[in-house]
Amino acid sequence: MPRRRVIGQRKILPDPKFKSELLAKFVNILMVDGKKSTAEKIVYTALDTMAEKSGKDHLAVFEEALENVRPAVEVKSRRVGGSTYQVPVEVRPVRRNALAMRWLVEAARKRGEKSMAARLAAEMLDAAENKGSAVKKREDVHRMAEANKAFAHYRW
């Protein structure tokens, strides 16, 4: 942690096909072993499949899926005295996107379809319709925060 100045966030270049920074970030999260072109191919194939099945615009379905997976609150552990409390805190906008994308990718990896593109497309379509593992994960996080609302005054 620097003492003098706050370090700014690195600017991410928008993806080449749709010119979206959010999609570029998603490709980076999906990428394994630095194979960006493979990750891009998977994402673009998944987006095409989604657009075909839903009849909507590529980015519209992607945005809708992300919106339904973004968490509003989460719990953080806070030690007070001898015990640890799960304190509900609001999630910052950048972290909301990061968590939503990470959960979508994790949920897609656990699915049973043949290719990763098919898994990703199916998970995002489910998320756009408010179902699927990624949405369930968000609901679980919200439920945890709701259950621990009594400890909200321990926020820092």
Swiss-Prot record:
It comes from Vibrio cholerae serotype O1 (strain ATCC 39315 / El Tor Inaba N16961). InterPro entries: Ribosomal_uS7, Ribosomal_uS7_bac/org-type, Ribosomal_uS7_CS, Ribosomal_uS7_dom, Ribosomal_uS7_dom_sf. One of its GO terms (cellular component) is cytosolic small ribosomal subunit. GO terms for molecular function: mRNA binding; rRNA binding; structural constituent of ribosome; tRNA binding. Part of the 30S ribosomal subunit. Contacts proteins S9 and S11. GO terms for biological process: ribosomal small subunit assembly; translation. This is Small ribosomal subunit protein uS7. Pfam families: Ribosomal_S7. Keywords: Ribonucleoprotein, Ribosomal protein, RNA-binding, rRNA-binding, tRNA-binding. CDD domains: uS7_Bacteria (cd14869). The gene is rpsG. HAMAP family: Ribosomal_uS7_B. One of the primary rRNA binding proteins, it binds directly to 16S rRNA where it nucleates assembly of the head domain of the 30S subunit. Is located at the subunit interface close to the decoding center, probably blocks exit of the E-site tRNA. Belongs to the universal ribosomal protein uS7 family.
